[in-house]
Amino acid sequence: MDMTFFRAALLGACVLLSGCDSATTPASPASTATVLDGKTMGTFWRVSVIGVDEAKAEALRAKVQAQLDADDRLLSTWKNDSALMRFNHAADTRPWPVSEAMVDIVTLSLRIGAKTHGAMDITVGPLVNLWGFGPDKQPVTTPDAQAIAAAKARTGLQHLQVINQSGRQFLQKDIPDLFVDLSTVGEGYAADHLARLMEQEGISRYLVSVGGALVSRGMNGEGKPWRVAIQKPTDRENAVQAIVDINGHGISTSGSYRNYYELDGKRISHVIDPQTGQPITHKLVSVTVIAPTALEADGWDTGLMVLGPEKAQQVVREQGLAVYMIVKEGEGFKTWMSPQFRTFLVGEKN
């Protein structure tokens, strides 16, 4: 039995910086991009900014890391004392007070969950843990039907409610052991939060990323739009499938081809279908979404990834989303994009 676990450095994130931030070859010294980076939420963050001197850059680095650490304390399922895990551990089914940020994230997640027919399910945590992609250890044997059914009984968006009352925000669950997992949208939220920090700091030209979620504004060091490359679904790093301009938007990619392990001779994807309780097995290997915010993009790409190519395309058409898909076909891949996504393609602009 092969229990080798394969995990990419970016935990399956397959959106790359395209090298257009001029960090190494600026147009002129005054327009050089300052690049800051670090680690958060089990992945990496990167901030590229224009017009920031060395002293401000170091202060900015500290603010970025502090903010991301706070986001992690809000959303982490790996920290038992995070705000989210305190809600998960509580057996009380009465309304539980939470922050406005938490309510915003959960509200959007529930909305996308409904529009993807339950495919984007932030209560899928028990199944994620059962299959070894959460804080629990990886299984040594394939979970049986009884274990899957028991985990599924603790899931379901219908068990979670958002309450806004007299200026206060609450989450309420109707089963004590409901487990909410916001890792599917955490990177998107954190990227948007970094973008707001840049605005607060008076920085109007930036590209920020947390894992596979990115947000940009303004022009890069060469006076051109920030560009992002979508990676080909191969083990070769920096192999580019397409390049897009995302100025003023968020982008996120969900992929099934890097975060997996092998168990009982089968490849186990980290993407779990809430309906079956099992990892996906369809041919869709990558979904990229461009949306007004990275949080929205991060939520949609997860739901569409679960649905598979045919059902996902139907939802994309219904919702008018900007989406790019890569589908396994024989020994190669085929691509599909919505008309809304095509408007962001660099090749379509030139």
Curated annotation (Swiss-Prot):
<keyword id="KW-0808">Transferase</keyword>
<comment type="similarity">
    <text>Belongs to the ApbE family.</text>
</comment>
<feature type="binding site">
    <location>
        <position position="41"/>
    </location>
    <ligand>
        <name>FAD</name>
    </ligand>
</feature>
<feature type="binding site">
    <location>
        <position position="187"/>
    </location>
    <ligand>
        <name>FAD</name>
    </ligand>
</feature>
<dbReference type="InterPro" id="IPR024932">
    <property type="entry name" value="ApbE"/>
</dbReference>
<keyword id="KW-0479">Metal-binding</keyword>
<feature type="lipid moiety-binding region" description="S-diacylglycerol cysteine">
    <location>
        <position position="20"/>
    </location>
</feature>
<feature type="binding site">
    <location>
        <position position="301"/>
    </location>
    <ligand>
        <name>Mg(2+)</name>
    </ligand>
</feature>
<dbReference type="GO" id="GO:0016740">
    <property type="term" value="F:transferase activity"/>
</dbReference>
<keyword id="KW-0285">Flavoprotein</keyword>
<dbReference type="GO" id="GO:0005886">
    <property type="term" value="C:plasma membrane"/>
</dbReference>
<keyword id="KW-0274">FAD</keyword>
<feature type="binding site">
    <location>
        <position position="272"/>
    </location>
    <ligand>
        <name>FAD</name>
    </ligand>
</feature>
<dbReference type="InterPro" id="IPR003374">
    <property type="entry name" value="ApbE-like_sf"/>
</dbReference>
<comment type="function">
    <text>Flavin transferase that catalyzes the transfer of the FMN moiety of FAD and its covalent binding to the hydroxyl group of a threonine residue in a target flavoprotein such as NqrB and NqrC, two subunits of the NQR complex.</text>
</comment>
<keyword id="KW-0997">Cell inner membrane</keyword>
<keyword id="KW-0472">Membrane</keyword>
<keyword id="KW-1003">Cell membrane</keyword>
<feature type="signal peptide">
    <location>
        <begin position="1"/>
        <end position="19"/>
    </location>
</feature>
<feature type="binding site">
    <location>
        <position position="181"/>
    </location>
    <ligand>
        <name>FAD</name>
    </ligand>
</feature>
<feature type="binding site">
    <location>
        <position position="298"/>
    </location>
    <ligand>
        <name>Mg(2+)</name>
    </ligand>
</feature>
<feature type="binding site">
    <location>
        <position position="78"/>
    </location>
    <ligand>
        <name>FAD</name>
    </ligand>
</feature>
<protein>
    <recommendedName>
        <fullName>FAD:protein FMN transferase</fullName>
        <ecNumber>2.7.1.180</ecNumber>
    </recommendedName>
</protein>
<feature type="lipid moiety-binding region" description="N-palmitoyl cysteine">
    <location>
        <position position="20"/>
    </location>
</feature>
<dbReference type="GO" id="GO:0046872">
    <property type="term" value="F:metal ion binding"/>
</dbReference>
<keyword id="KW-0564">Palmitate</keyword>
<keyword id="KW-0449">Lipoprotein</keyword>
<dbReference type="Pfam" id="PF02424">
    <property type="entry name" value="ApbE"/>
</dbReference>
<feature type="binding site">
    <location>
        <begin position="119"/>
        <end position="121"/>
    </location>
    <ligand>
        <name>FAD</name>
    </ligand>
</feature>
<dbReference type="GO" id="GO:0017013">
    <property type="term" value="P:protein flavinylation"/>
</dbReference>
<feature type="binding site">
    <location>
        <position position="302"/>
    </location>
    <ligand>
        <name>Mg(2+)</name>
    </ligand>
</feature>
<feature type="binding site">
    <location>
        <position position="184"/>
    </location>
    <ligand>
        <name>Mg(2+)</name>
    </ligand>
</feature>
<keyword id="KW-0732">Signal</keyword>
<keyword id="KW-0460">Magnesium</keyword>
